[in-house]
Amino acid sequence: MSNPKAPTATEAAALFLSVNNIEVVYDHVILVLKGVSLDVPRGGIVALLGANGAGKTTTLKAVSNLLHAERGDVTKGSILFDGVEVQSLSPNDLVRRGCIQVMEGRRCFAHLTVEENLLTGAFTRRDGKSAIAQDLERVYAYFPRLRERRGSTAGYTSGGEQQMCSIGRALMSRPKMILLDEPSMGLAPQIVEEIFEIVKDLNVKEGVSFLLAEQNTNMALKYANYGYILENGRVVMDGEARALAANEDVKEFYLGVAGDKRKSFRDVKHYKRRKRWLV
């Protein structure tokens, strides 16, 4: 896939996040991302799709500047968040500027209560207890289930409640953009739908932008405006969400559907091997 042309000044002003041809290496040896470029506009929901190991989580960690903890480095390219080079900022500086990541696997503090977990999200704030209390109520308005479980130990809540807690904790930092990693992982379909509806509400009502890494292609494209497909550390396809959802390659490769007929896992594997655009 050819590299996208540089955006015009008007286009650049409309972008919240611009990832430009980045390469990521772990342990100075393992090349994981191989020239990834993507954009997230202000107020947009962008889906980052691909199978396990495609490079989605690494891309998010590059944006949130968390690679160093795993001996990873961006060795080529640039990442701009709201016009500022990400590599010049610490992760906590990024949070203060409005960019926060909700990690894969929820990562709640199991020994703390739900409310204590939420309050940790306000750690970088300096605007006083009253403002933080107001935002806590705002989180409970989006997640009524968390209000009911506010005094419960987070480690004893359900997977769906922990995912809600993780997103609520991110909201406590007053983010402009949330990097959301595999929100549907291990959750029942009804809970997944509920979480994605909340993501949509946050986008529409609060103006929060999202970069959403997700293996559930169908669900992600239902709520996203635009999508990028990663394979083997490269962007192999991108486009408007509706166009990707209707694309025959996407349907056959990721959804296992040819026309109206669902294919077997064996057929899908064969299809993956013979498609040249995924080399």
Question: What are the residue ranges of the model-derived segments?
Answer:
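ABC ATPase signature
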Residues: 112, 157, 170-171
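Helical segment within the ABC ATPase nucleotide-binding domain
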Residues: 193-207
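A short, proline-enriched helix->beta-strand linker immediately N-terminal to the Walker B motif
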Residues: 172-176
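The feature captures the beta-strand-to-loop junction immediately N-terminal to the Walker
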Residues: 49-51
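ABC-type ATPase nucleotide-binding domains, specifically the catalytic core motifs of the NBD
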Residues: 27-28, 67-70, 114-134, 142-144, ...
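ABC ATPase NBD Q-loop/coupling interface
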Residues: 66-67, 78-96, 124
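ABC ATPase nucleotide-binding domains
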Residues: 255-279
